[in-house]
């Protein structure tokens, strides 16, 4: 993923030797603590009973770009070994693409040379690197008081009521600030698990203390950059900011956010636009929602095609699957938002150095 000043490249495959990330553009002097990085990676494992039975230790190995506990300003490379991959079953289904997965288009794209085991490079396993990128971005944002947090807004038909940013950031629950809604979400995930099926959901992400002035029109649009980043996450099928698609039902008099003065600075009375106008941050909390489709790998029979015989066949998957990926997606969504914000913040600071 390439920003103007920050970029990262993911490498590895789900069942390969390792996965990892190369991050370029990080300034020198960011303090790095491996235990903090590991804590972020632990969050990516989600709620155990609804996650894959694949158990990876996810020990990050910093290969370059960090010395004596601080970034050096040169490219950062971090490696995470794959220790618990089981590829045996994937040989049986290599010619029967799994519905909902990238198996078929990937085979076409790469002329059949792609690593099909566990989804290969298309696997959610690659988000290990995304979370690592997010760790570095969050450390940079911390210097300016910017914080990013995501929570589960919906699982299937169960929705968490809208929460204020203060309530979200004060909540001890790492998944959802509304305990009643969270219990009902757990029940919905359990129903899917027991039936051999899966369930989708929505993640809401909020960033606070974001200064006004990040972004710009057209190619500099921060919403466009955020949406592009969020859509790169496997299983994401929708992104909206502020009230999003609800704007289509409203009048301008309802939708507009009146400007007011709060504590000596310009703010808006409401935040329907999610902290962005004209592709530029307003100084209000940045709010986005991300829709995740249900995990495509399920234990129920599905129809597919045998690509060798060109026959329609029934596919019954065996393996280790998530019944819901939404809980483990929280640090991934945070990471993408933090990385885009960090890139735009560095751009803004460059301008400030010239103009001011």
Curated annotation (Swiss-Prot):
This protein's record includes keyword Flavoprotein: yes
SUPFAM superfamilies membership: Chorismate synthase, AroC
HAMAP family according to UniProt: Chorismate_synth
Cofactor mode of binding and number, as noted: Reduced FMN (FMNH(2)).
Reactions this protein catalyses: 5-O-(1-carboxyvinyl)-3-phosphoshikimate = chorismate + phosphate
Pfam families attached to this UniProt entry: Chorismate_synt
Family: Belongs to the chorismate synthase family.
Gene Ontology terms describing biological process: amino acid biosynthetic process; aromatic amino acid family biosynthetic process; chorismate biosynthetic process
EC number(s) reported in the record: 4.2.3.5
Highest rank taxon of the organism: Archaea
Amino acids binding FMN: 121-123, 278, 293-297, 320
PANTHER family: CHORISMATE SYNTHASE (PTHR21085:SF0)
Protein name per UniProt: Chorismate synthase
One GO cellular component term noted in the UniProt record for this chain: cytosol
UniProt function note: This reaction introduces a second double bond into the aromatic ring system.
Cofactor(s) the protein requires to work: FMNH2
Gene Ontology molecular functions: chorismate synthase activity; FMN binding
Binding locations of NADP(+): 44, 49
InterPro entries tied to this protein: Chorismate_synth (IPR000453), Chorismate_synth_AroC_sf (IPR035904), Chorismate_synthase_CS (IPR020541)
UniProt cross-references to NCBIfam families, sorted A to Z: aroC, PRK05382.1
Alphabetic keyword roster: Amino-acid biosynthesis, Aromatic amino acid biosynthesis, FAD, Flavoprotein, FMN, Lyase, NADP
Known pathway: Metabolic intermediate biosynthesis; chorismate biosynthesis; chorismate from D-erythrose 4-phosphate and phosphoenolpyruvate: step 7/7
Gene3D superfamilies in UniProt: Chorismate synthase AroC
């Amino acid at each position: 993923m390439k920003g103007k000043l920050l970029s990262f490249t993911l490498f590895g495959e789900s069942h390969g030797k390792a996965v990892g990330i190369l991050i370029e553009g990080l300034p020198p002097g960011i303090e790095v603590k491996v235990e903090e990085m590991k804590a972020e990676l632990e969050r990516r494992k989600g709620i155990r009973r609804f996650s894959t039975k694949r158990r990876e230790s996810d020990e990050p190995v910093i290969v370059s770009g960090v010395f004596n506990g601080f970034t050096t300003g040169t490219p950062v490379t971090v490696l995470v070994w794959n220790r618990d991959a089981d590829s045996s079953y994937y040989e049986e289904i290599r010619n029967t693409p799994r519905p909902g997965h990238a198996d078929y288009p990937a085979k076409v794209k790469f002329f059949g040379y792609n690593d099909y085991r566990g989804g290969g490079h298309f696997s959610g396993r690659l988000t290990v690197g995304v979370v690592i990128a997010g760790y570095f971005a969050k450390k940079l944002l911390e210097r300016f008081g910017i914080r990013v947090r995501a929570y589960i807004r919906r699982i299937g038909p169960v929705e968490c009521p809208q929460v204020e940013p203060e309530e979200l950031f004060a909540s001890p629950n790492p998944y959802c600030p509304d305990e009643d809604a969270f219990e009902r979400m757990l029940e919905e995930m359990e129903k899917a698990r027991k039936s051999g099926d899966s369930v989708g959901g929505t993640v809401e992400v909020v960033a606070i203390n974001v200064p006004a002035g990040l972004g710009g029109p057209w190619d500099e649009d921060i919403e466009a950059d955020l949406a592009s980043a969020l859509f790169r996450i496997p299983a994401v099928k929708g992104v909206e900011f502020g009230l999003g698609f609800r704007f289509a039902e409203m009048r301008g008099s309802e939708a507009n956010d009146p400007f007011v003065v709060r504590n000596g600075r310009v703010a808006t009375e409401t935040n329907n636009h999610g902290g962005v106008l004209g592709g530029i941050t307003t100084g209000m909390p940045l709010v986005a929602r991300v829709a995740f489709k249900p995990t495509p790998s399920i234990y129920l029979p599905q129809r597919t095609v045998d690509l060798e015989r060109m026959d329609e066949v029934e596919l019954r998957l065996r393996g280790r699957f998530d019944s819901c990926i939404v809980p483990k997606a929280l640090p991934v969504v945070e990471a993408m938002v933090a990385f885009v914000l960090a890139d735009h913040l560095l751009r803004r600071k460059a301008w400030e150095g010239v103009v001011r």
